[in-house]
Design a protein with these regions (language model features):
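Beta-strand elements within well-structured catalytic alpha/beta cores of enzymes
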Residues: 1, 47, 73, 167-172
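Residue-level signal for short, function-critical loop segments
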Residues: 3, 78, 174
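Loop-to-helix element that buttresses phosphate recognition and phosphoryl-transfer chemistry
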Residues: 4-60, 64, 138-154
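Phosphate-coordination/substrate-recognition cap region in phosphate-metabolizing enzymes
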Residues: 30-125, 131, 158
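Active-site-adjacent alpha-helix immediately C-terminal to a catalytic or transition-state-stabilizing loop
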Residues: 55, 63-64, 69, 146-175
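Extended, histidine- and acidic-residue-enriched regions that form the cofactor-binding/catalytic faces
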Residues: 111, 132, 137, 141-142
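Short helix/loop segment immediately N-terminal to the Walker
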Residues: 120-124, 137, 162-167
């Protein structure tokens, strides 16, 4: 999982919004790199989501282990779960507004996504330039855990599984 982000610090639902690592997150990434370095592994494959917090986590790890790969694969399918209309909102405030049970249901139930994010929101992935190369019909407005699982596992099976005989780093999210 990527290091702590700025919105993790603010206790906000992040989803597909591109937020930076917090100072603590940068430290966590470097510590992960130190751990990997001690293992003295030859890592052949590198994957990350499209999101800056995962990309920067991977870069900090690679800098720490002194590896400069030319084969980093960025895959939007490895992105965090899309939290729909909860995106950008503070978790504690939403618990007060909707009730703890309702927020828990959106966060942890298997197939119950939050309400879709309004297409006009600046947080909607269709309005964020890093997603311009993704076909519009593939960009979600919200996701359940099941939707996220299917997206990530499908990508893993089709693209990563064939490389499991090698050492791999995947810098992604804790869905």
């Amino acid at each position: 999982r990527h290091g702590q982000s700025e919105w993790n610090l603010e206790n906000k639902f992040t989803g597909w919004v591109d937020v930076e690592l917090a100072p603590q997150g940068k430290l966590e990434a470097c510590k992960a790199g130190e751990f990997i370095k001690k293992l003295n592994l030859e890592i052949k494959h590198f994957y990350t989501s499209y999101q800056l917090r995962s990309i920067d986590t991977l870069k900090l790890i690679l800098n720490t282990i002194r590896v400069k790969p030319n084969n980093i694969i960025k895959a939007w399918q490895l992105n965090e779960r899309h939290y729909g209309s909860l995106t950008g909102l503070k978790k504690d405030e939403m618990k007060k507004k909707l009730g703890e049970d309702e927020v828990h249901k959106f966060r942890r139930s298997w197939d119950n996504p939050p309400k879709p994010l309004n297409i006009n929101s600046p947080y909607h992935p269709k309005n964020i330039s890093i997603y311009n190369d993704i076909p519009r019909n593939l960009i979600p407005d919200t996701e359940s855990l099941k939707d996220t699982y299917e997206r990530v596992v499908s990508y893993f099976v089709e693209n990563i599984e064939k490389n499991l005989q090698d050492n791999i780093i995947i810098s992604a999210h804790g869905n």
